[in-house]
Regions:
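Conserved C-terminal portion of the radical SAM core fold
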Residues: 1-12, 31-33
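Radical SAM enzyme core and accessory elements
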Residues: 15, 20-23, 29-160
């Protein structure tokens, strides 16, 4: 149902592929065993060479600059919406009532917990615009409440 582009590809190639419909893109990847445990990359043990070496904050900012909503959502997998269940929601267009608010809520978590001030500002402006585009009014209201809760507390992991 989608294709993923890794950091093996350059920023330029990744940008072109996003505009062709790529649904997932990695950022700040580490490709060596134990690579996420250390700040410094161990280049001689990497599985492949990374072409896009930007930080996750830079990739998230770049995605928003290009009109994409960065999402850290894993709700479908965690809720068992896989295979036929997932495809049924996709074919009817109802997945939008899950994906869109989930993307905005997970983006809020990233912005609050990890983003630079510049990325945070950009992200909250995008979220404000995008909330009005959630088609289901009840879902929109719940998403707004959850986003406000994420900003005001340590509560996380809201999902539809």
């Amino acid at each position: 149902t989608g294709m993923i582009v890794s950091t093996r590809e350059s920023e330029k190639v990744r940008g072109r592929l996003l505009n062709l419909g790529i649904s997932q893109i990695s950022g700040a990847s580490r490709t060596s065993v134990g690579g996420y445990e250390k700040e410094e990359r161990v280049h001689d043990s990497e599985q492949f060479e990374v072409s896009d070496t930007r930080t996750l904050d830079e990739v998230v900012g770049w995605l928003m600059d290009n009109g994409h909503i960065p999402s850290f959502c894993t709700a479908c997998y965690r809720e068992g919406r896989t295979g036929d269940r997932f495809m049924a929601l996709c074919k009817t267009g109802q997945i939008l009532n899950c994906c869109h608010p989930n993307a905005l809520m997970t983006l809020t978590e990233f912005l609050v917990d990890y983003a630079s001030e510049e990325t945070r500002k950009k992200g909250f402006e995008m979220i404000e615009r995008e909330l009005n585009k959630i088609p289901n009014e009840k879902r929109r209201e719940i998403a707004i409440n959850n986003i406000n809760d994420i900003k005001a507390s340590n509560r996380r992991d809201f999902r539809f």
